[in-house]
């Protein structure tokens, strides 16, 4: 009796736990998922298993905060300096085009998703019924293959067994015919329409993800360009040495300086265009007969671009980077969410709750 006194409370607790699980089965999935998504080993938001729920999370933000996000994009766009090299201006413009275009893409995707869900309501039962019959047909076809294999292995004189097996095959074929006839005549047209809607939904989803990823990646690039302003400015001594060598027609030393610059530029972001100019310059001077006009043009373009790069980056570091960081705070948890290193606690809880609910994916098969 004394033993039971100690055990009873634990049994009651277990029964309560089972009762909770029975009433809230999603809780069994939610708690481990929340623990995992808030842990140090949590997957990044780019993880494929998180995409459905992250999209739900972001679309709610787009619907509720569209004006706030658009205003932030437009306000930051007004701050973009005018003294930008062409390639940097292209990156800024691409960012703003993608960021502002997000909302139209989302609306189209949501419209397509509604059309898909509406069609799927009536189509689901038909799909399940036909796939069940098709599965039976495949099983029967496998049986027929085995019987045909058995026939091939029989002795030529074993006519009796051969006839029995062929009779079984005929019966199976009749069964297949019956099952095929039970498939509604509308199946092919309905299935074709469903596949069109599914493809449209998947295409728009990919388009949306590509759009926001490119938008935020461009902003990341811009921030990195600005932060690397000191590294680029520190090349000024080599640039002056290059000017001096070119003016004195010391082309061998000029080539050596350019080679050294190439190595350093590989560690500085956003210098591809400048590296191309240096490459053009080295092409001109690495010749037996040097075209002075081409040399003058190539060197002028190279040094102008360097000064332009240093100038806009220094100016942006003082006057644009703080506003860029503020702007980033507005868009990083919606447009830029997929490219963050991890989920916030709020996001992790939402995704864990969303993923804990069973979703029917049978229509994909």
Model-assigned labels for residue ranges:
Residues 1-365:
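Alpha-helical transmembrane segments of multi-pass membrane transport proteins
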